[in-house]
Amino acid sequence: MLTVTQDMMLPTAITGSYPRPLWFDLSLNGRSFKSALGESLFREQYLDAVAAIINAQEAAGLDIVTDGDSRFDLAVGGKSWFFYPIERIDGIEGHRDTSRGWMSRHDLRPGKILWEVQEAYQPGIVKRKLERGPLEYTAIWQVAQRMTDRPVKFGAICAPALASMLWNEFYKED
């Protein structure tokens, strides 16, 4: 009989982003999260969306809840998952259109979801030394944690995936 996990709790949670309510139609559009919370319509929609998402998870009996990545803008194919930090890290300027080459190599055409995603994803250009920017992850987490007694987890893109969405014009390649 397996006894290694006999007394270990396996807490339940969701993975990935939660669908955005249709009435939540405002976005950060590159703004600071804290600044956006100062705008009454964004604040109301954001807080209502996070409360609804947390309540749904609690009603489902999940042990660890999430804000559903509600900070992300309405964008094609989850673009905001990459671009939330790209828009805020110092040293990144503008965008480079790499879509045509990528799409022709993979025989993609309009109407296919990967065409739409690739056309929307324009890598940010690293023009100078990358420096810390105002990601405000603590403030985003605190908003959600105030709405529940359960632990709140928080998702963010990992560094290797983020690097894959940047066009380097500053650092020497290895």
Feature locations, PLM:
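Domain-level signal for soluble alpha/beta catalytic cores
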Residues: 1-174
